[in-house]
Every structure is written in structure tokens, then in C-alpha cells.
């Protein structure tokens, strides 16, 4: 299945129940690869996608959230923000652009580094939602979990240089929720 971007956006809903059908590796690989094509500040690529299929890890994610879809989905994506100053910019950007970007990151305190990394991680998460929909998969983006428990579940316990952007349950839908509706317009031109 392949949808246009507009179709994937229009059809995407939060789905919390899934069939038992496993997600083929090639489809999951495409979703993750497309998610990681998301733009990031300075192209610093300060987000990782942890692909969770192991039931024990999914059980730990459920314990961190009490959200059954994280336990029951065939796969869960944990979008992790690299909340420290990047060290690989010369390899990613070349020396001149890396020097400029490093100057920016050097001016940030720990809270600002975390905030900018989380913004990048949320871009990756949004791309993952649309990429999954385009492949015929349903998703449930979640918040409301204990971040330290999520980090522990994916092997990053005690790391203050990592943060969780979003935890996304994913699988083939066992339900088709109706469109929940939207306000007539949230668009604001120029200023409030």
C-alpha cells in the first residue's frame, strides 16, 4: 500500500488496537528510514528511533505508561532525543558548517540542549506517523509515560543526555476510528 502524503495525513487516526499480523521487516525498515529523513536543526540528526518488538520491553513500556497499546502492538517506536551537544558534526556537515553549528550548541545550557533535541525528535516522530500510515500501518502516538522508566526500558536508564520525544505504538489496525473533528480554523495570520 502506498498513499500520497496528503492521503496519509487525511486518513491518519490514533488507533489503539491492532491485529496479530506482524509488520514485515522491509516495511518497518522503510518507515524508520523515512522518519529519519526528517529535518533537524543544522542537520545535526539528534534523534534516534528505537524499534521495539521484544515483548519484555513492550511490557516495561506498558508499566511506564499503563497504556495497553504499547504492550499489545506488534511494534513500538521510541523516539529518543540526543539531549547533549553533538560530537559528530564534522563527519555530518564538514568542518566549516560544523564549526558554525558547534558555536550555536556551545552557547546552550543543558535545558536548551534538551529542548532543541526534543524539537528534532518530534519532527522525526511526525515523519514516522505519516510514513507508517503511507505503508498501511496504524499508529498511536503517546505521552503520559514516566520518561525515566521509558529510558530504562530501552537501555538508557540513568542517562541525562537522552530524552524521550514520543512513544508510538504501531501495527495493522483492528479498528477504524472516525475522524474526531477539528476546530474550523486554528490558522492565525501574521499575529494574534
Task: Provide a role label for each language-model segment.
Residues 1-192:
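Acidic, surface-exposed loops and disordered segments
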Amino acid at each position: 500500500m502506498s498513499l500520497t502524503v496528503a492521503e496519509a495525513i487525511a486518513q491518519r487516526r490514533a488507533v489503539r488496537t491492532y491485529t496479530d499480523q506482524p509488520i514485515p521487516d522491509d516495511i518497518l525498515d522503510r518507515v524508520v528510514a523515512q522518519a529519519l529523513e526528517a529535518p533537524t536543526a543544522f542537520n545535526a540528526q539528534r534523534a534516534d528511533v528505537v524499534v521495539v518488538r521484544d515483548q519484555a520491553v513492550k511490557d516495561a513500556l506498558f508499566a511506564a505508561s499503563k497504556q495497553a497499546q504499547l504492550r499489545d502492538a506488534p511494534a513500538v517506536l521510541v523516539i529518543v532525543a540526543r539531549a547533549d551537544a553533538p560530537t559528530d558534526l564534522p563527519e555530518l556537515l564538514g568542518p566549516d558548517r560544523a564549526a558554525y553549528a558547534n558555536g550555536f550548541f556551545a552557547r546552550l545550557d543543558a535545558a536548551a540542549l534538551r529542548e532543541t533535541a526534543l524539537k528534532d525528535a518530534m519532527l522525526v516522530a511526525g515523519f514516522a506517523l505519516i510514513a507508517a500510515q503511507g505503508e498501511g500501518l496504524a499508529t498511536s502516538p503517546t505521552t503520559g509515560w514516566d520518561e525515566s522508566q521509558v529510558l530504562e526500558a530501552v537501555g538508557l536508564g540513568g542517562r541525562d543526555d537522552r530524552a524521550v520525544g514520543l512513544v508510538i505504538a504501531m501495527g495493522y489496525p483492528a479498528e477504524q476510528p472516525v475522524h474526531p473533528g477539528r476546530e474550523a480554523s486554528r490558522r492565525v495570520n501574521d499575529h494574534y
